[in-house]
Amino acid sequence: MLKFFEKIFGSKHEKDVKKIQPVIDRINELHAALVPLSDDELRARCMELKARVRKTLEPIESKRSDLYLKLDDAAISLEDADRINEEIDELAKEYETATAAVLEEILPDTYAVVKDTCRRLKGHVYTVMGREATWDMVPYDVQLIGGIVLHSGKISEMATGEGKTLVSTLPTFLNALTGRGVHLVTVNDYLAQRDKEWMNPVFEFHGISVGVILNTMRPEERRRQYQCDVTYGTNNEFGFDYLRDNMAGTEDEMVQRDFYFAIVDEVDSVLIDEARTPLIISGPVPNADNSKFEEIRPWIEQLVRAQQHLTASFLSEAEKGLKNEKPDPEAGLALLRVKRGQPKNSRYTKLLAQQGVAKLIQTTENEYLRDKSSRMHEVDDELYFAVDEKASTIDLTDKGREFLSKLSHQDRDLFLLPDVGTEIAAIDADSSIAAPDKIMRKDEVYRLFAERSERLHNIAQLLKAYSLFTKDDEYVVQNGQVMIVDEFTGRILPGRRYSDGLHQAIEAKENVKIEGETQTMATVTIQNFFRLYKKLAGMTGTAETEASEFYEIYKLDVVAIPTNRPIVRRDMDDLVYKTRREKYNAIAAKVEELQKKGQPVLVGTTSVEVSETLSRMLRAKRITHNVLNAKQNEREAEIVAEAGRQGAVTIATNMAGRGTDIKLGEGVRDLGGLFILGSERHESRRIDRQLRGRAGRQGDPGESVFFVSLEDELMRLFGSDRVISVMDRLGHEEGDVIEHSMITKSIERAQKKVEEQNFAIRKRLLEYDDVLNQQREVIYTRRRDGLKKERLTSDILDLLRDYCDTTVEKHHKTHDVDALEEQVLRELSIEFKPDRETFEREGIAPMADSLYDLALAFYRRKEEAVPEEIMRQIEKYAVLSVIDKHWREHLREIDTLREGINLRAYGQKDPLLEYKQEAYNLFILLLHEIELETLSLAFKLFPVHPDEAGEIEERRRRAAIQQEKLMAQHEEAGSVYNAQPDGEPESQASKQQPVVADHSKPGRNDLCPCGSGKKYKNCHGREA
């Protein structure tokens, strides 16, 4: 029906492009007038455009500067300060409106200038990433359309090879004229550096400065790069700098400017694929014990080996049962036990491809799940541990606990969690136990619970490391470190770690150094970071499949840009084989055939392991080829440059799927162009489309096909049932291949299922983070004000006014003058001695005024006694140190709350609503503590004696060293294959750090390790 209306009225994208066409005509008209000008005259035209922008914005900037000067006046009243702040907010809105209007006016002129600059640069020879390059780009009309779409804050979907990098220069150049800084966001450091060097001539011609942020840069260098008119960098680097700036001790330590305009290259990769996990700055946990995984690793290795022997016996039993004419039900049970015990067993995955086997397992599983009481425990009881691969969970069985207790020579109860509620209730109900003894017994119950829960957690994480995570697939080991491989790009992710102790478990498994535990110091999700920008735009070749998510989460519209030349690439239906071995043999044979013909071929793989397997097979056939994967990425540019030459064979992970331009060599067009051979379907259709898009660029010929087997991860977990039944009905034998559009559609349905589940994960993550994001904005705004304001006196006195009102009101209700005196003395170091009769007779307001006048007089005397500069430093220190300390504690408390909130669902309560309420209560408490402690410090702090200055300087030096130890992590969630049952990624559903063992002494404000939920100082810390 939709297609019928589109034929009559035209599609949305056609209408979008039609609206822009008059602007394109105007740009081309203006460009024609620029051609006769000299280079200097063209530069002068650009300066005129810049002057128009400055002329529009300078009056507003001048008004704003005057208002900020008034705010710094020490004598300003609270009412005047509030009024001025409101005026500043209104001016900020006016500034954005004026900016948008003036840029819209000069857009045709600016784009014409950029187009003519590109024309003048033709033939210019320069260096890009150490290789000689010649400028040969002038924007086509379709590229001008893409540039207009980007400037308007939308997503420009352009087919691969249509020159997105050049398109980005148009809106970047235009918005750089404001001098506010434009950020070009790429997916990795290589592309950031390459694009900066590649596009620099256009900007350099007109004196527009261009910088790039790289992972290795120091803060001083980063600041210089951010001061440029245009800055290239990765989403992680921009995000981590934002977090670090909000932990800075002085304004000089901050590196970023305001967030004005960001253009995100490969926007689907950054805003969707990367959005399931937050950016986290973490610091070391003091006194953390890293030996716990090494201690239990030998037990787990033996347990895993025992499970392997057990599943091997089940497989032998199943193979016997499958020989019968009618499959034995016991064979189905044996196979189900293998699925639950060792789902990645190679013998098992081969059996799955046999006719009727997958259906037998599904029927058996349904039988055991059918009853309300679920008999799945009967299946699992024969195993040492049960694996749910889709949910990424592992449960130790009674048999496994028995095995571990014998190995460790410990009571099997040590591997069971005590029922805390029941045991505490029993202690409370026992009247024969004295009150002091009850406290001791409860403490023992809490201690046992904390100890055992930590041990069981570590066992589960080690079992996951051995059962669900494979070296050279999910991760690689390089230079004695476990490095995660990005499932979407195939690149190594330096600095990224699995959370909740899983990374340490993998380090123990691989016998490399186990890094220390960390705690969250600052965090933000990708979604909420990019919402900081006043204007956001993006470009990619594959956005339409996620258009609804882009609009729902980011309010970004997607506009499909027509190609400059028609796409002539031939996309063939998938070729489906029963086993991986058959598939790999077929791939090797196809590559050999193509090389003999001379047609270049790019073999796309989803993991390092597969790329190396295929490489070995091609070497055995003496086929010369290049390999590009996370282990061998140094020659990336060279390998990509050679991939389009006649007879070239390139095996690459998803690294070659984005941002790479494979140019065809001489004679290749006549051979059919580049041949794309996908060795497996990815969980995302977009990644597959990106791979196909390496061929057929700019009207070039090309071909693409995917080779799929029923043992592939996607097929095994989500899509194989229907395909297997079709193959069974058709009576396919080993080695046969099935090729049909129905099969291809079935595979795409499986991909859609995974994409929907991933969207649910991202949406849920965002719903939870939105709660923390509102709190983060309040805290970071306060902190930045504290950092940037010359004077904080008005803020301190504002806090004092509130303090006087609330404190007097609290004690006036009880008429307790002594308590009021004691509190004021303790918190402000002021002697306030109101007359008892006056206190009872007068109202709250007069008494609060008396306290305020007394405190204000004290503070003014302090300002006179202490040098101005030192007084300002005291105020700054009071604001910043208190915010930092309490915000870290708050993040820990939020982590703890988030970890257990899903259990509320068992009480018929919505976990999200419960989380919002609890988080709000914690935040109100946080603000109260921050305000009170800030005020108290501002009143109590005095300059130190010269003899103590050296000690304080040493303390500052130690704090700076600790800051260096902070680690930037983009926490890894993995794919939907490793998601929790409730659709949340494992690394997000769990706490960022495991329970700390009781021999690691917690801080006074840390949560007590006994599990009571109280702070340590209010629980077991009292005894200490």
From Swiss-Prot:
Binding-site positions, Zn(2+): C1008, C1010, C1019, H1020
GO cellular component: cell envelope Sec protein transport complex; cytosol; plasma membrane
Enzyme class per UniProt: translocase
Keyword check for Transport: yes
Requisite cofactors: Zn(2+)
UniProt feature coiled coil, ranges: none
InterPro entries: Helicase_ATP-bd, Helicase_C-like, P-loop_NTPase, SEC_C_motif, SecA, SecA_CS, SecA_DEAD, SecA_motor_DEAD
Alphabetic keyword roster: ATP-binding, Cell inner membrane, Cell membrane, Cytoplasm, Membrane, Metal-binding, Nucleotide-binding, Protein transport, Translocase, Translocation, Transport, Zinc
A molecular-function term among this protein's GO annotations: metal ion binding
Pfam families registered for this protein in UniProt: P-loop_SecA, SEC-C, SecA_DEAD, SecA_PP_bind, SecA_SW
EC number, UniProt record: 7.4.2.8
Co-factor: note: May bind 1 zinc ion per subunit.
This protein's record includes keyword Repeat: no
The reaction(s) this protein catalyses: ATP + H2O + cellular proteinSide 1 = ADP + phosphate + cellular proteinSide 2
Job of this protein: Part of the Sec protein translocase complex. Interacts with the SecYEG preprotein conducting channel. Has a central role in coupling the hydrolysis of ATP to the transfer of proteins into and across the cell membrane, serving as an ATP-driven molecular motor driving the stepwise translocation of polypeptide chains across the membrane.
Family assignment from sequence similarity: Belongs to the SecA family.
Protein's recorded name: Protein translocase subunit SecA
Gene name in the database record: secA
